Amino acid sequence: MNGIKHIFITGGVVSSIGKGLTAASLGSLLTMRGLKVFIKKLDPYLNVDPGTMNPLQHGEVFITEDGAETDLDVGHYERFLDVDLDRTANVTTGQVYSKVITLERTGRYLGETVQVIPHITDEIKRRIRLAPDDIDVIITEIGGTVGDIESQPFIEAARQIRREVGRENCCFIHVSLVPFLESAGEQKTKPTQHSVAILRAAGIQPDALVLRSDKPISSANQKKIALMCDVSAVVNAVTVPNIYEIPCVLNQHGLDKFVIKHLDLEAGEIDWSYWDDVLDAIENNRSEIEIAIIGKYTGLPDAYISVIEALRAGGFESKTKVNIKWVDSDDENLEDQLENINGACIPGGFGIRGIEGLIKAIRICREREIPTLGICLGMQCMVIEYARHVVGMHGASSTEFTDDTQWPVVTTMLEQRDILIDDQFGGTMRLGSYRAVLSIGSLAASLYGTTDIHERHRHRYEVNNGYAQRLVERGLIVSGRNTEQDLIEFIELDRKDHPFYIGTQAHPECKSRPKRPHPLFKGLVAAALARKEIAEFNSGKTVLQ
């Protein structure tokens, strides 16, 4: 095996077809064979990063250890490969053009006419090649669909890389949809044929096809696609009920073996130990609970994809299936919506819309003793609710929502104030991994099993230390602080007053893994399961073991 090998994942027909999960699953298979894999996403949009994008359009913003605001697919990569990636794992058109324009303005091109080829494509290639020194394979997912005008420079850069490293060191995998037409009663292969034709017109002949469908594609249709597209390696990736089955599906169809042979990789036998326990927990669950995600962006589940997967993983060890109940913070019937849930999670967000609904839902959860986990904005709203209804600070709020409140129990971080005045919103929050020291004997410390932790962050606002003492005097526990900046990182209620009520300023969902569930989510699932079992015992439906 000579040098780093490259695998490019492209998509056709429609977006959101599963390129990211295909890339993550293939990366997992190669990792399980002993290879060192680095994986990244190329996003063709002009935004520098997704940090300022609407979650209802783009989905969640995934935070890396080094503080990059990245595409949600980077979260899939981390979970499937069980690695921590950095900011080089997500490249956008905005980043590329910003860099090239900066180089031009500073005279680095020595008066050349700056063009898409070679200057933009050279910068894309440079970023594709950024990876640790000991890597065997770089998997690069190219966002969007072939034929999109925004994707053309990325496709061209990938073509050039294949020419530079040699065809034997580069593999192109094209993911395409094979739709089923109800009126005709058959699957249609023509969209995939056209998609591959567009890719070939750009100078790329795919080496393998991953055909997405809701129903199995007939052998005749697979052979037809292979013939018409001149591709021998054709894999049918049928929609599965849980995403962690995808590595098994791709392996059963031999995709990883094909890639290893094509790239002449020195790979060992596959070790399924990482996925065996996860799949067993999913397929053989012993119990089932319902946890509400109460948020502002429930219209698009992808806005909370890492929270969803963290909750699911929280139940794997105890073989507990976690069903998600979506509760919009603007819902007028929150009391009814939260009537029979076993637990609640209030994730992050921005802006004033839906805030009063969040505060109302949090009050319901606190007073009904529903196990509750607040994340970022969720924790801030927990503090606001407590200040209003327990401490008596009527009208308490955050300076994010109003400047007129008498009780700004959540306020703008000191270093963020000038940033907001100058309207510098992109990439300027408190981002990345920060340390917190937890109080001995607290719920937080008992869940983590230590008092010294690091979590990923993405915020501009903090709990106001000026009101902390009054909150503490009325029973709110400040159980974790960042000692360097004296920031409140964790709050909770005494377990004598509430079975599980905890909030964190961090985004713990970003560090959860299928095999290593995050302790906060694992704790929430355990508390929710206990609540359900007690309720069933009291109603005579079951006997506690």
From Swiss-Prot:
Active-site residues, record numbering mapped to chain: 376 (nucleophile), 507, 509
Q: Which residues form the Glutamine amidotransferase type-1 domain?
A: 290-534
Q: Which PROSITE patterns match?
A: GATASE_TYPE_1
Q: How is its activity regulated?
A: Allosterically activated by GTP, when glutamine is the substrate; GTP has no effect on the reaction when ammonia is the substrate. The allosteric effector GTP functions by stabilizing the protein conformation that binds the tetrahedral intermediate(s) formed during glutamine hydrolysis. Inhibited by the product CTP, via allosteric rather than competitive inhibition.
Gene3D superfamilies in alphabetical order: 3.40.50.880, P-loop containing nucleotide triphosphate hydrolases (3.40.50.300)
Annotated CTP binding sites: 15, 148-150, 188-193, 224
Where, by residue number, does ATP bind?
A: 16-21, 73
Write down the chemical reaction(s) this protein catalyses: UTP + L-glutamine + ATP + H2O = CTP + L-glutamate + ADP + phosphate + 2 H(+); L-glutamine + H2O = L-glutamate + NH4(+); UTP + NH4(+) + ATP = CTP + ADP + phosphate + 2 H(+)
Q: Where does UTP bind?
A: 15, 188-193, 224
Pathway where this protein functions? Pyrimidine metabolism; CTP biosynthesis via de novo pathway; CTP from UDP: step 2/2
A Gene Ontology biological process noted in the UniProt record is: 'de novo' CTP biosynthetic process
Per the UniProt record, which EC number(s) apply here?
Answer: 6.3.4.2
Which keywords does the record carry?
ATP-binding, Glutamine amidotransferase, Ligase, Magnesium, Metal-binding, Nucleotide-binding, Pyrimidine biosynthesis
Q: Which GO terms describe its cellular component?
A: cytosol
Which residues make up the binding site for Mg(2+)?
73, 141
Q: Residues annotated as region Amidoligase domain?
A: 1-265
CDD domains assigned = CTPS_N, GATase1_CTP_Synthase
Gene Ontology terms, MF aspect: ATP binding; CTP synthase activity; glutaminase activity; identical protein binding; metal ion binding
Q: Where does L-glutamine bind?
A: 349, 377-380, 400, 460
Q: Describe the subunit structure.
A: Homotetramer.
Purpose: Catalyzes the ATP-dependent amination of UTP to CTP with either L-glutamine or ammonia as the source of nitrogen. Regulates intracellular CTP levels through interactions with the four ribonucleotide triphosphates.
> Record's family?
Belongs to the CTP synthase family.
Other comments? CTPSs have evolved a hybrid strategy for distinguishing between UTP and CTP. The overlapping regions of the product feedback inhibitory and substrate sites recognize a common feature in both compounds, the triphosphate moiety. To differentiate isosteric substrate and product pyrimidine rings, an additional pocket far from the expected kinase/ligase catalytic site, specifically recognizes the cytosine and ribose portions of the product inhibitor.
Against PANTHER family, the record matches this protein to:
CTP SYNTHASE (PTHR11550), CTP SYNTHASE-RELATED (PTHR11550:SF0)
- Family matches, as HAMAP family: PyrG
What's this protein's name? CTP synthase
